[in-house]
C-alpha cells in the first residue's frame, strides 16, 4: 500500500482511560399539532453559549451533549441535568422534546435548514437525498488509548452492528406511512455519499491513506464529512458509534450506552491480550445491517465468517452474559442488565406500532406516546 505524505498523517489524540460521551439528537414538536417546529435557533439562543447544546442540519433539531464521563451513570446524569433546562425552555415556547429515528408523519419539504456553510455545502452536493434527512440518532464516543487499536476495534465491532440497531430501532414510519422497516432511518442515512458502513481497515495508515484520497479527489474537505456508522474521532481520541436510531427515554439510552461501552472496552482489552479480533466478510456485515433495519428484534443475523446464523435476541442473551465482568469493571452492570428489558418488553418501533394499532392508526397518538416517554 502506498504511504501518505507527512502532511496527510492524522494524529490520534488518544484517551488515557476508556471514557464515554454521548450526543443525543432531539426534534422539537408543537405541543398541539405534534408536527415538527423549526424553532431550534430561538431555543439555543435562549440557552446561551454552552458546550452541552448544539445546532444540527435542520432548524427543528437540538443536540444535547455530555462532557467526558467515566461511566454510563455519569453520562446519564449529565444529560438529565441539561435536558431539564432545555425542556423548560422548549415547553415555555409551546413545544415538546421528541426523539425517535424518524417523525411518524412530518414532511421533509416544510423543514428549514440551519444557516451554516457546511450544511449549505452538504445540500448543494447531495440535493434531494440531503433534503430528505429528516432523521435523528444517538452517537456514543468511547476513549481509545492508541491509534493502532482504532481500526481493528471498528472492524470487529461491526459484528455487533445488528444487535445495536435492532435494540434501538425506532423509525417504522415515514411521511405518514408504515415503511415495513424497524429502522427506516438506517436505510435513509446511508444514501449520503460518505455515510453508511465503514471500510474494514486493519491499520491506522490504511485509514490515513483513505482520508488522503478522499481529500485529494474532492470528496471531502474535512474529517467530519466522513459520516460512517462507526468512525474514528481523532481529535477526541475516541471511536464514535453512530448506529443507533433516536432513543426516547433515559433508561433505555443508559442500557444502550452501557452495552456500547462494554463492547468497545472488551475489544480493547482483547487487543492488549494479544488476540486477533474476529471480523466478518463485508457482504455479511452489509446483510446484517439490512436484516436489523428491516426486521429489528425478529432478525436472524449472520454470526461469523462461516455463515452461521441465529436470532438476534438469542445471541444478545449470550452476549450480555459474556460482558457482565466488563460491565462490573466499568460500573455499569445495572444499566447493561436493562438491555434485556428492551427485547422483553418491545423496542421503540414495536411500541409505536402497538400505539398506532390501539388508536386506529392515529399517528398523533404515536407522537404523544414518544413525548411522554421522556421522563426527567
From Swiss-Prot:
Q: Does the keyword Ligase apply?
A: yes
SUPFAM superfamilies assigned to the protein according to its UniProt record, in alphabetical order: Glutamine synthetase/guanido kinase
Question: Which top EC class is given?
Answer: ligase
The name on file for this protein is Putative glutamate--cysteine ligase 2-1
List the lineage, top down: Bacteria, Bacillati, Actinomycetota, Actinomycetes, Mycobacteriales
Which UniProt keywords are present, listed alphabetically? ATP-binding, Ligase, Nucleotide-binding
Asked if the keyword Nucleotide-binding belongs to this entry, the reply reads yes
Q: What does this protein do?
A: ATP-dependent carboxylate-amine ligase which exhibits weak glutamate--cysteine ligase activity.
The entry assigns this protein to a family as follows: Belongs to the glutamate--cysteine ligase type 2 family. YbdK subfamily.
> What InterPro entries does this protein's entry cite?
GCL_type2/YbdK_subfam (IPR050141), GCS2 (IPR006336), Gln_synth/guanido_kin_cat_dom (IPR014746), YbdK (IPR011793)
Protein source organism: Mycobacterium sp. (strain JLS)
Cited Gene3D superfamilies? 3.30.590.20
Its recorded reaction(s) are: L-cysteine + L-glutamate + ATP = gamma-L-glutamyl-L-cysteine + ADP + phosphate + H(+)
Q: Which HAMAP family match?
A: Glu_cys_ligase_2
A GO biological process this protein is involved in?
modified amino acid biosynthetic process
MF (Gene Ontology): ATP binding; glutamate-cysteine ligase activity
Q: What is the E.C. number?
A: 6.3.2.2
Amino acid at each position: 500500500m502506498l504511504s501518505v505524505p507527512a502532511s496527510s498523517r492524522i494524529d490520534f489524540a488518544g484517551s488515557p482511560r476508556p471514557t464515554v460521551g454521548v450526543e443525543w439528537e432531539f426534534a422539537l414538536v408543537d405541543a398541539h399539532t405534534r408536527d415538527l417546529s423549526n424553532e431550534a435557533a430561538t431555543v439555543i439562543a435562549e440557552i446561551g453559549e454552552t458546550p452541552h447544546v448544539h445546532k444540527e442540519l435542520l432548524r427543528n433539531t437540538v443536540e444535547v451533549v455530555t462532557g467526558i464521563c467515566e461511566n454510563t451513570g455519569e453520562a446519564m446524569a449529565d444529560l438529565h441535568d441539561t435536558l431539564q433546562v432545555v425542556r423548560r425552555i422548549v415547553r415555555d415556547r409551546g413545544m415538546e422534546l421528541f426523539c425517535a429515528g424518524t417523525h411518524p408523519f412530518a414532511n421533509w419539504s416544510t423543514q428549514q435548514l440551519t444557516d451554516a456553510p457546511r450544511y449549505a455545502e452538504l445540500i448543494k452536493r447531495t440535493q434531494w437525498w440531503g433534503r430528505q434527512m429528516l432523521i435523528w440518532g444517538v452517537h456514543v464516543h468511547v476513549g481509545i488509548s492508541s491509534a493502532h487499536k482504532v481500526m481493528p476495534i471498528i472492524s470487529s465491532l461491526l459484528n455487533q452492528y445488528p444487535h445495536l440497531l435492532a435494540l434501538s430501532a425506532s423509525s417504522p414510519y415515514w411521511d405518514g406511512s408504515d415503511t415495513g422497516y424497524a429502522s427506516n432511518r438506517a436505510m435513509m442515512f446511508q444514501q449520503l455519499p460518505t455515510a453508511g458502513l465503514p471500510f474494514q481497515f486493519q491499520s491506522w495508515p490504511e485509514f490515513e491513506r483513505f482520508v488522503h484520497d478522499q481529500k485529494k479527489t474532492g470528496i471531502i474537505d474535512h474529517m467530519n464529512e466522513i459520516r460512517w456508522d462507526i468512525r474514528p474521532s481523532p481529535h477526541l481520541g475516541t471511536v464514535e458509534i453512530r448506529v443507533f436510531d433516536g432513543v426516547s427515554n433515559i433508561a433505555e439510552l443508559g442500557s444502550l450506552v452501557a452495552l456500547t461501552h462494554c463492547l468497545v472496552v472488551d475489544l480493547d482489552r482483547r487487543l492488549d491480550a494479544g488476540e486477533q479480533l474476529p471480523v466478518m466478510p463485508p457482504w455479511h456485515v452489509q446483510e446484517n445491517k439490512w436484516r436489523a433495519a428491516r426486521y429489528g428484534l425478529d432478525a436472524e443475523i449472520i454470526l461469523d465468517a462461516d455463515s452461521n446464523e441465529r436470532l438476534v435476541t438469542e445471541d444478545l442473551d449470550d452476549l450480555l452474559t459474556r460482558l457482565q465482568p466488563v460491565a462490573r469493571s466499568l460500573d455499569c452492570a445495572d444499566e447493561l442488565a436493562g438491555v434485556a428489558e428492551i427485547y422483553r418488553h418491545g423496542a421503540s418501533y414495536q411500541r409505536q406500532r402497538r400505539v398506532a394499532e390501539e388508536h386506529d392508526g392515529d399517528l398523533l397518538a404515536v407522537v404523544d406516546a414518544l413525548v411522554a416517554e421522556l421522563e426527567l
